[in-house]
Every structure is written in C-alpha cells, then in structure tokens.
Amino acid sequence: PYTTLFRSQAVIQGWYPDMTWQMMADAAFAVEAGATYFVTNRDLTIPRELGIAPGCGSMIRAVITATGVEPVASAGKPEAYMYDEARELNAAEGHDLVPKEASIAIGDRLDTDIEAGNRGDYDSLAVLTGVTNPTELMLAPSHLRPTFIAPDLRELGEAQPEPVRDESGTWECRKASAWFENGQVHVSDPTSMDGLRAAVCAAWEAADQGAQLSEATVPVFAIEA
C-alpha cells in the first residue's frame, strides 16, 4: 500500500486482471505525490470468450481521471518499440535481422496495433476477429489506417488484392466496387471483403479531400464467412 513514509519514484501500470480498487488508488496517490507515471499498453478493451471486457487502458484512464496526470510514456503499443524489439530479439538468437519491409504488424485494434505499425513505418494488417469493425475502418483517420485488411489470420498465406481507382473515381477490387457520391460512400457488395477493401479506399479518399464522413454516410457491412 502507498504510504507517505516511502514515496515511490515511479509508477508502472500494466495489464493485471486481478487489479483492485486499492491498487489503482495507491497508484493514484503515488502519481499525485510526484511519482513518474509509466504504462505498458493502452488498449481500452480486450476480447474475451463472453464478449468485450475492459482492458489495461480502461484501468489507466481511472488513474488519469483521479490525478489529472497523463503517463509520460507507454512501453507497448501504440509505440513501435515492441515491433522493433521483436526483430532485434529474433536477430539475437542467431538469425538475420528481418528488415522492416519484410515485416508486418498484425492486430485487431486500430488505435494500438495499427497505429504502432504506422509510427514505426511498418506495413500492417487489420483483422476483423477482435474489436475493429468495417465502419471503424472506413472512418479511420490517416494515422490509424492499415496497409491490408483481412477477416482473420488465415489470409496471411494469400495474396491481397489491390483496389484500383478508375478515371471516374470508382474504386474496384476484383468484382467489387465502391464510390463516393452526394456525401455518401456506396458499395456494390456489402457482404464481401473485396467490397470492404474498395469502400475503405473510397472513404479514405473522400475524407482526405475534406468530406465529413460518419456512420450515417458509409455502408453497413455484413461480411460473409
């Protein structure tokens, strides 16, 4: 427990599912007293068998709310250090250092997994098996946009189709197409991954050109398994 007799110099808050109110209170007391505040990751939620549960970031927010102090740094995502360290650890075991252009950041969260990849200049793959959904992908700001999109990890061994923009402004991905017209993103097939890939390109292009997109201006997807 925190005590004024032994002032902590630093607080490191990480993922601990058995964290109690008293633990968070002790962290807050120490931070308020001047301890430097570090965190390991800021995932607000975490997928579990029964649904979406609070993640490390939610518990971090409780301490931030109580103290008004933001962590000075995060050891995990959305910083890219973890990806750099993974490459270096692999090389330390006697393997060649894998270049960034031969690496890919994979995850289900845009604001941690994918942002970390973008910060570190890694290609990234967003999968739909966790918290990110098609709407969030279409509305993603530039720093949260993945290089590739897949329904799950099974597509890692398959070539990704590249959406192509034609002269009319329509984005095509194999047999699916998407376009922006009258303030709306339209898609030919809202049940396929290719439709989503095309729609994402149309939405991002429109947003980058100043369009104000929202859930009401992008199509609803129901991706078929």
PLM regions and their residue ranges:
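Short, small-residue-biased leader/transition segments that mark boundaries at the very start
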Residues: 2-5
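Structural motif
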Residues: 9-14, 38, 104-106, 150
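Active-site glycine- and acidic-residue-rich loops that bind
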Residues: 14-24
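Glycine/Thr-rich beta-alpha phosphate-binding loop at enzyme active sites
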Residues: 40-81
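Acidic, Mg2+-coordinating phosphoryl-transfer loop and its flanking beta/alpha structural elements
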Residues: 105-139
